[in-house]
Amino acid sequence: MKFAKKLTATIAVCASVTFAGAGVSSAKVFHGHWIGGRIEEAYHRLGGWKTFGDATTDERVAKNNGRFQVFAKDASIYWHAGVDNGIAHQVGGRIRNKWGDLGWEGAALGYPITDELKTPDGKGRFNHFQGGSIYWSPETDAHQVWGGIRDKWAQQGWETGELGYPTTDELLTPEKTGRYNHFQGGSIYWSQAGGVHSISGPIRDFWGSQGWERSSLKFPTSEKYAAGGGIKQDFQGGSIQYFEPTGKALE
């Protein structure tokens, strides 16, 4: 019995072995679980035990021959040889929860290609993934944005632009002919016929009051632009113009 206790304590502190995971040849045991290779590199690069706490699993197989490991402080590290030059990345908290809801690395977002990072405005956090991004802020929680909608949002300054943070995931429109994300300061809509366009302010309010894309206006086909002393935006079925002095948007 004394020998067994002594052996367990020795293993729990540190050991090195031949290891076939995450592109490495050696690994160590930290508090009872093996951590090795690129996952171990990320573990130490991002602060080690102070950031992650104890490993709660050994390294496990992920989709498409990747690897991952789960840690006590609500975080995981994921690795794939073909992603970001084989660098392992951390994903945690509400962002990890959202990623999990959407199907983890086996779904459209794929593997993380960044660690969780602070947003330039200092108010939120994000991870970029192979297929898109997840952004979190205290006011909006975590939401996914990808594809043409993400590209448009990026063109307009990400979360530092007029639109702010996403307040929904990308969703299918009710009639299933388009996609959209709502943001703190507006929306971005995509349709095959109209392309991808942002819409905000009084023009968005008026469009919404008419029934959104289900109205006779249908989907936006342009960004807003100056015209006739006001601000105008074109749609499949017409235009909406907003005049600052009156504060009214007219079709």
Pin down the residues of each PLM region.
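Secretory targeting and sorting signals
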Residues: M1-A27
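Extended, compositionally biased repeat/scaffold regions that form elongated interaction surfaces
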Residues: G23-E251
